[in-house]
């Protein structure tokens, strides 16, 4: 399944905003591993490339390619943004993850940072 990681804890809890609920299903384990092992950013990007993770927009942009270009950008200050805009009427693809699995979004953002 292409989105197994994104959706494995979606709607498995009555209180998805609670960190303990997310952790019950293995949430934040990957972040803890990356921090504990001091995984270099290039290795994280390579793992994302191998996973073929893609953006949820219409173009399905390759996430590793995006992260690689951000890492190579000049300057010392960088920011991580989460674009949850759904411009199409009735579109709820981002909203469903942000409401049903908000900690997965946060964990991904932290890893990407």
Where are these regions (language model features)?
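Feature of Fe-S/electron-transfer and energy-metabolism proteins
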Residues: 1-113
């Amino acid at each position: 399944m292409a989105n197994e990681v994104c959706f494995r804890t979606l709607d498995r809890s009555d209180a998805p905003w609670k960190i303990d609920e997310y952790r019950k299903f293995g949430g934040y384990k990957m972040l803890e591993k990356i921090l504990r092992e001091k995984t270099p950013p290039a290795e994280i990007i390579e793992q994302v490339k191998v996973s073929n993770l893609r953006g949820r927009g219409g173009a399905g942009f390759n996430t590793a390619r995006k992260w690689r270009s951000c890492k190579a950008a000049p300057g010392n200050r960088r920011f991580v943004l989460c674009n949850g805009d759904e411009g199409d009427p009735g579109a709820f693809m981002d909203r469903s993850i942000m409401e049903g699995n908000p900690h997965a979004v946060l964990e991904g953002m932290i890893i990407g940072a």
